Amino acid sequence: MRYNKEEIEEIKIKFFAQVQDEYDYFRKKVTKKGIEGVYADSLQITFYKEVYRYLMYDNLSEDDYVQFLGEPIIKKLWEVFTVSELPRQSRDYLRQLVKLYRENEKEQRRAA
């Protein structure tokens, strides 16, 4: 179904309000856990913050706004991330980090 410009603007307004509500609810829930809960959930907190910024400030396609309206989209993206990306990304990232550290150490030794 195609939407006219006014309908898309209305959908975007509802979408942004929905994302803001979802993010605010998550933040309140996490902060109720205290400092230990914040530490335990730090990766999820960072993920939510970055996805929130992306959804609020980048231009999505009109189809995305329509499809995501009414969905707890940040939560659903977190679920996808934890199942498909997190296990692979953490290991790959740490391997790259160790490799970069070693390369930097070699360069510093050569320069000394």
Which functions belong to the PLM regions below?
Residues 2-112:
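Acidic interaction surfaces
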